[in-house]
Design a protein with these regions (language model features):
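Short beta-strand/loop segment that forms part of the nucleotide-sugar
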Residues: 33-43, 64-69, 94
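Donor-binding/catalytic cores of nucleotide-activated saccharide
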Residues: 73, 77, 94-202, 206-224
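Cell-envelope/extracellular polymer assembly enzymes that use nucleotide-activated donors
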Residues: 4-6, 36, 186
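A conserved acidic beta->alpha catalytic loop
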Residues: 24, 41-50, 70
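Short, acidic, metal-binding catalytic loop of nucleotide-sugar glycosyltransferases
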Residues: 23-34
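Membrane-interface aromatic/basic loop that binds lipid-linked glycans or pyrophosphate carriers
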Residues: 115, 272-343
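Glycine-rich, basic loop-to-helix element that forms the pyrophosphate-binding segment
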Residues: 68-84
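Short aromatic/hydrophobic "clamp" motif used to bind/position activated sugar donors
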Residues: 89
């Protein structure tokens, strides 16, 4: 490896955002020599590839574009990790960007660091760049810790804050699930059983965009992507099941299980409440429910206690399990009318 840091940018139909993203990575010449920017074009149908290739002749020692067939988010991470030349590796989504000044300071400090995982701050912004919220860590900065101390602290690590040592990921044979979105959860949790050392550098590097229409976190997209969460959760359960007894004793395992429970409740709610009553995925939710009953009985039990609202304590998952039908709020309205008006 002859680079200090590799930035992997999974890219699919991002022509409207890619210039902003890539321009934010333009650093002073000396730092550019230490940086590898790898744009993994995931079969984009717009001008994303053309835009990305514009940077190669201008910065041939830094920018590199990989054009490949569509395989979704995880396939881009896997390809980037396979070919990364940096001692460290970080993910940047193509519709997000870095604060260039903070990134430059981070690169300067990174030269003097030797750790399996580095944490930095990030900010959540809207598509116009307006600040929504800031995220930092209540951890002593600029001090190398044994990662076990972080695990025991209960701190949650966001994908946007994490940089990993590339060799560590390769040694644990890290591989992200392909063919689906939302696998950034894997990037946060899976490598942690291989991390021995960690340091927190309080630079506000990452700008994470929330609210852009069409992004994977858009509510309309989420409603159509429940099958991705189904596959992700099955992969997470399989990963957790195969951890060693020693790894299962660590706080990381508890966080994985908590995330499995949290995301599972989202699948139930999406299928049984949010999706259109006439078009929800009946086969998927039945298979998912059976899977959770067998693999995670406690999650299955907790799902049965889910209610629509605090003021409407209807256990909609339990109702569906008993009747095979989704609970309809219309039923409450009709019952009220019959009682109140005799209709």
């Amino acid at each position: 490896m002859n680079k200090l840091l590799t930035i992997v940018i999974p890219t699919y139909n991002m022509q409207d955002y890619l210039h902003r993203c890539l321009d934010s990575l333009l650093l002073p010449d000396k730092q550019m020599e230490q940086l590898e920017v790898m744009v993994v074009n995931d079969g984009s149908k717009d001008n994303s590839s053309i835009i990305a290739h514009e940077y190669e002749p201008k910065h041939p020692k830094t920018f590199r574009v990989i054009d490949k067939e569509n395989g979704n988010y995880g396939s881009c991470i896997n390809r980037g990790l396979k070919e990364a030349a940096g001692k460290y590796i970080k993910i940047l989504d193509a519709d997000d960007w870095f604060d260039t000044a903070e990134f430059s300071r981070y690169m300067e400090e990174l030269q003097h660091i030797d750790a399996d995982m580095i944490l930095t701050n990030h900010q959540v912004v809207d598509d116009a760049g307006n600040l929504t919220s800031k995220y930092s860590y209540n951890i002593e900065p600029n001090k190398l810790f044994a990662f076990q101390e972080y695990k025991e602290s209960g701190v949650y690590f966001a994908m946007h804050s994490i940089t990993y040592r590339t060799q560590m990921l390769r040694e644990i044979k890290y591989r992200q699930t392909e063919g689906i979105s939302y696998t950034d959860t894997e990037w946060v949790f899976y490598p942690q059983h291989g991390v021995q050392s960690c340091i927190y550098l309080p630079f506000d590097v990452y700008r994470y965009v929330i609210g852009r229409e069409g992004q994977t976190m858009d509510a309309k997209v989420l409603l159509k992507s429940v099958s991705h969460y189904d596959k992700l959760l099955r992969a997470m359960v399989d990963f957790a099941n195969h951890l060693s007894t020693e790894d299962k004793a660590l706080y990381t395992y508890q966080r994985i299980e908590a995330q499995i429970a949290h995301l599972s409740m989202g699948v139930y709610r999406t299928c049984l409440v949010l999706q259109d009553a006439d078009n929800y995925d009946k086969e998927l939710i039945k298979a998912f429910d059976d899977f959770m009953k067998n693999e995670r009985p406690q999650v299955y039990k907790e799902a049965g206690q889910l209610t629509l609202k605090k003021y409407l304590p209807i256990h909609y998952v339990r109702y569906w399990r008993i009747t095979g039908k989704r609970f309809s709020v219309d039923w409450i309205r009709d019952t009220y009318r019959r009682i109140r008006y005799g209709k």
